[in-house]
Regions:
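Histidine-/acidic-rich catalytic cores in large beta-rich domains
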Residues: 7-9, 34, 38, 45, ...
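Extracellular low-complexity, O-glycosylation-prone stalks/linkers
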Residues: 9-22
Length: 554
């Protein structure tokens, strides 16, 4: 869009089926514009109004255009349906992603899809950033784990699909990638691989991808509950700069735990006291102020800034209480199977070591995943139920928007597929309108490296040749991706004339047969290997094979 005589701002409006469903965005003043349009209906002729704005925001000129779009892909057809709607929402657009919702999408207040990404995400989907971009969990690379394989490749992406940075995570990622502070380092949930999984937090330098701090939960908690591979199952982490603490939602310990991020000292534990009774950690458990039932296998536990109880001596913690018991049934004989989930708010007096439950709103029973989100500007409380149990008509997900004070349902939508989370689609239209700029070092972090070994250890060429269609091979940049089903390969040997390297996952032993059906592309970095002509051998299903694949590093 070109304006010759002076600089103007631009506002676009995609006309909705109702006035409240209009989607608008503004671009700062300039003499020419690239106008990103978000909010088009799929498979329709969309009316879009473009307006020129002067310095005072007055409309100086306008034009109406029509944009025709393609229909939704089959996987998103009829994926959402309103149960009840007030006709307006605190969110212009709500994004849904992860689990079986492989293509993220956003819907409006009427339950109509207005945006989607035609690229699949990993199991946990994406994570919003303060700059209105997202960290995208990619499907290109997975590292074997003790249970579920974990995605190693993360992208900083905008809503137009432009990738600005790429982060490699050697141990893979799960459940949470969140900024420590706006624009700052990333806190990532990963796995220690030391007989346990989904039990580790890493702080990733935003500029380099290097790990600058970490916490393995078994370093601060040692007790009888370490008896499971997935003993902790951390699903949320966030940072409180005023106290230099992180808040962890530890699902399989039924606990929300606050830890000093520098000293790694436990500050307190929010949990039913009976769970920690008789252990060294019962002294950290907050004392109940009042009579209430605690959470079971919670998700999205966050400390919020809003003072919801009118007491400046307390902090508020919101969470989604799945109220489901899958692990440790023998340890928890007090579980009340209500077959409901709940949006909870706790008020914590840290000085006195007490906790009070100040809000409890029931939702449909969602056994895993899901999210609770308090929206301060509207005073609305969102319940994003990602894995609904026993739903009528086979629906797998449900989202709610409540008035916080009255607990009245303002909007409710059912979804055909399970999802990991749903949240507001926050958009910076000026960022989307800007030409894409890449940092010189836009690939950051590192993967598990092949280790150089003695040449004589692998002098003997394998007697067996692996059938050509058993594995797939693809080199992207300086990374070799080997496609296979989970835990079929334990070693990859790169045999050169002068150098030999081994990529070894032998010690990563699978504990759940379910994931043997998971097809993954194992990322093997090549940039640290010496110049040579290499043959690729593999230990495949405990057999030593020649793949008859070769490559050269010059």
């Amino acid at each position: 869009m070109c304006i010759r005589d002076r600089e103007y701002g631009v506002r676009f409006t995609v006309k909705g089926k109702t006035a409240a469903a209009d989607i608008s965005g503004e671009i700062d003043a300039a003499s020419s514009h690239r106008v990103p349009i978000i909010g088009l209906y799929p498979g329709e002729d969309n009316t879009v109004v473009l307006e020129l704005l002067d310095d005072s925001g007055r409309v100086k000129d306008s034009q109406e255009i029509t944009i025709t779009t393609e229909a939704l892909p089959e996987s998103l057809t009829d994926v959402i349906e309103p149960v009840e709607t007030s006709g307006e929402s605190a969110y212009d657009l709500t994004m849904v992603y992860g689990q079986r919702t492989h293509l993220p999408f956003a819907y409006d207040c009427m339950g109509d899809i207005r945006w989607y990404m035609n690229k699949e995400t990993g199991n946990y989907g994406l994570y919003m950033l303060s700059n209105c971009r997202m960290i995208w969990q990619d499907t290109a690379g997975y590292v074997p784990n003790l249970e579920k394989p974990q995605s190693t490749n993360l992208y900083e992406l905008d809503y137009l699909g432009r990738a600005y940075n790429m982060y490699y995570l050697s141990g893979g990622s799960h459940h949470e990638v969140i900024e420590k502070e706006p624009g700052g380092n990333l806190l990532v949930l990963t796995s220690s691989m030391q007989s346990h999984c989904e039990d580790k937090v890493e702080e990733i330098d935003r500029q380099t991808g290097a790990v600058v701090n970490e916490l393995k939960l078994q370093d601060i908690i040692k007790c009888k509950y370490e008896n499971l591979v997935d003993w902790a199952h951390i699903n949320t982490v966030s940072y409180q700069p005023e106290t230099d603490t992180i808040l962890l939602s530890v699902r399989n310990l039924e606990s929300v735990i606050k830890v000093n991020w520098t000293t790694k000292e436990i500050q307190w534990i929010l949990c039913d006291p009976r769970f920690w009774e008789g252990t060294d950690y019962e002294k950290y458990v907050l004392k109940a102020d009042g009579d209430f039932i605690y959470q079971f296998q919670q998700h999205t536990a966050y400390q919020i800034d809003t003072d919801l109880d009118g007491d400046d001596q307390t902090i508020e913690i919101t969470m989604f209480d799945n109220h489901f018991l899958w692990r440790r049934k023998k340890d928890i004989d007090y579980y009340d199977k209500t077959e409901e989930s709940y949006l909870l708010v706790y008020s914590v007096n840290e000085a006195e070591g007490t906790v009070k439950q100040i809000k409890k709103i029931p939702t449909v029973w969602s056994k895993i995943t899901s999210a609770a989100i308090y929206e301060a500007d509207s005073n609305h409380f969102f319940g994003m139920c990602g894995h609904v149990a026993n739903a009528e008509n086979g629906w797998k997900g449900m989202t709610y928007e409540f008035d916080y004070d009255t607990e009245k349902v303002l909007n409710q939508y059912c979804l055909k597929k399970t999802f990991y989370r749903a949240e507001e689609m926050r958009i910076d239209y000026n960022d989307l309108a800007s030409p894409m700029e890449l940092d010189e070092n836009y690939i950051k972090g590192e993967l598990w490296q092949p280790v150089k070994t003695w040449k004589w250890l692998w002098n003997k060429k394998p007697d067996q040749v692996l059938p050509a269609d058993t594995l797939t091979y693809n080199i992207t940049g300086k990374v070799l991706y080997i496609g296979t089903y989970d835990h079929q390969i334990s070693q990859v040997i790169f045999k050169g004339a002068k150098n030999t390297y081994v990529y070894d996952t032998t010690e990563v032993r699978l504990h759940m047969e379910t994931f043997l059906d998971f097809y993954e592309n194992i990322p093997v970095p090549l940039q640290g290997m010496n110049a040579d002509n290499y043959e690729i051998y593999v230990m495949y299903q405990d057999g030593f094979y020649d793949t008859q694949q070769t490559f050269a590093i010059n």
